[in-house]
Amino acid sequence: MNIFRLFNKQRTAPAARERLQVLLAHERSSAGSDLVTLLREEILAVIAKHVQLDHDKVQVTIDRNEYVSTLEIDVEIPLNAAVQAA
């Protein structure tokens, strides 16, 4: 037994934090595609209640970094689109 080990304890908090970050990133990436699909369909349904649109002219992108995820939806609405009353 080394006496210096008693005074020089290993710090496990950084290793535990890193493992948790890896786990959270994995969970976000696996559930992300289902969430994007669900959000896309719900947002398009709401827009379609008010304006006629072409579902093929919709682009959805999601950007992820360490702290935030950004969902961007680009919907092309024609100038002659009929506006429906809600």
UniProtKB/Swiss-Prot annotation:
Which HAMAP family does this chain map to?
A: MinE
Q: Name one GO biological process term.
A: regulation of division septum assembly
Which keywords does UniProt give here? Cell cycle, Cell division, Plasmid
Protein origin, superkingdom: Bacteria
Q: Which family does it belong to?
A: Belongs to the MinE family.
UniProt function note = Prevents the cell division inhibition by proteins MinC and MinD at internal division sites while permitting inhibition at polar sites. This ensures cell division at the proper site by restricting the formation of a division septum at the midpoint of the long axis of the cell.
Q: What is this protein called?
A: Cell division topological specificity factor
Q: What is the lineage of its organism?
A: Bacteria, Pseudomonadati, Pseudomonadota, Alphaproteobacteria, Hyphomicrobiales
What NCBIfam families does its record include?
minE, PRK00296.1
Give one Pfam family, short name only: MinE
